Amino acid sequence: MKILVCIKQVPGTSNVEVDPETGVLIRDGVESKLNPYDLFGLETAFRLKEQLGGTITTLSMGPMQSKEVLMESFYMGADEGCLLSDRKFGGADVVATSYTLAQGTKRLGDFDLIICGKQTTDGDTAQVGPEMAEFLGIPHVTNVIKILAADEKGLTLQMNMEESLEIQRVPYPCLITVDKDIYTPRLPSYKRKLDISKNPEIKILTLKDMYDTNEKKYGLSGSPTQVERIFPPESNVEKTSFEGDGKVLAKALLGILTEKKYLG
């Protein structure tokens, strides 16, 4: 069984600057980490490999520093890794990102199963996985919280649809996005880290390596949406001080709670 897991390096801090001209996050040199939801995707792949055998390839898109998350996936148990990195890919929205990942997947060959985390912590759109499946022309199932059955032909999955649980059977090849409730992710193996050579091979693909080399379909040029600005939510916190003895303070507090209708 050939499994592909899409992973992403996301900012590890909220102190991230934004390019004033493009509205894009400036990621170079920023403290980063593996997207938490992708840990659940990796663990799902490892469990399926243990059950059905096969190989696991991890795929990421970003600057060269994104090789760090691919290395982390090696230490956890991935067999191969590939990074899509080109300045022409920069500033991509969900559509351009999905298209780039789909093109990269085609260059890597055929996969039985593609796994994505439900969403990323820097975008929270939960759209890349489904859009990637559409570009590849394969069925997809989202919000997976449990694999009820897995065999050589397909998967039986339970999905969390917020107000209900849904069960579906999907044949290979397919793409699934997994939620945080599916498994507890394993930690990177120190022994495996020692066993892996200092410079394990990570395949690097650029725009010229894609089957479709039309740069207008990638990055900012291929993005139908663009971010105007990113800003923290406004906080309207009012502070009021009262002075007096216990009876005065109790009366003041009672008045506020009554006014705010906290007491019914």
Swiss-Prot record:
It is an enzyme of class 1 (oxidoreductase). Its main location: cytoplasm. This is Lactate dehydrogenase (NAD(+),ferredoxin) subunit LctB. It comes from Acetobacterium woodii (strain ATCC 29683 / DSM 1030 / JCM 2381 / KCTC 1655 / WB1). It comes from the Bacteria. Optimum temperature is between 20 and 30 degrees Celsius. InterPro entries: ETF_a/b_N, ETF_b, ETF_beta_N, Rossmann-like_a/b/a_fold. It holds the Pfam family ETF. It catalyses: lactate + 2 reduced [2Fe-2S]-[ferredoxin] + 2 NAD(+) = 2 oxidized [2Fe-2S]-[ferredoxin] + pyruvate + 2 NADH. Binds 1 FAD per subunit. Its EC number is 1.1.1.436.
